[in-house]
Amino acid sequence: MTEPPMRIALLIALLLSSLSAYSEPLAPFAAEFRIYVNKLPTPVKADLVLEPAGKPDYYHMLLKAKSFLLTNKEESYFYWNDCQPRTDRYVHEFDGFGQHRYHHMQFQWDPPRVHNESEDDAASMDIADDTLDELTILLRGRCVFATGDKEYTVTSAYGDDLRTHHFVVIDREKIDTPLGKVDTLVVENRRTGDSKKKRRTLFWVAPDLDYMVVKAKHIESTFLKAEMIMIDYHGPTLEERAAAAEDQAKKTRPGAE
């Protein structure tokens, strides 16, 4: 029988291999989603893309929803180090219904500060050193959930506002995706100070896909619910990701060369 000290050593090794896998470079992907409102399909589709951006540990993440009536685009350029995204710049643009609204945000970190330009204003504000943007806040969950923790809190900067988000795992669910049936964690984004008690935002994140969002749901009220469901995916398959994780685990096992 394995002695307790050896058990502890093995558990530490397994934990370190798990953390190491999620501090590795991010795997690029492109996914397409269909938007449903009150369970009815709409003509709106959304693209979610993660790709390297030309410098070491530097990435571009894009979420773009488009139909013949509107275009809504969010994108973030950020560095990824030690399981932590650090935003360089963030853009949110909306075109539709005769309106054009936008936020162009430039982050600096010495000292931590963000400058925002919008359609009618420009302002700067100090931020905490761990502040994220609205698009990359879920990436932080990769490493938190990989350790077995069920919740985390982050602050995001948006426009001239700072927002606190509390993400909590509330369930597990197997769902159908373009890659087949996958196991997911159901994560709720609990906003601090939200005046609408019935408003909820849920994300289904897949551990076997590096905690990628494969489904999202926003409940505005009893009568208005919207869902974003993945309908296409291009990137590492479940088998390729499992093989890469196993290879990484072998490298971090005690006695590995």
Where are these regions (language model features)?
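Short hydrophobic "helix-edge" motifs at membrane interfaces and signal-peptide entry regions
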Residues: 9-10, 169
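Hydrophobic helical h-region of N-terminal Sec-dependent signal peptides
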Residues: 10-16
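Acidic, serine/threonine-rich low-complexity disordered tracts
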Residues: 24-109, 146-257
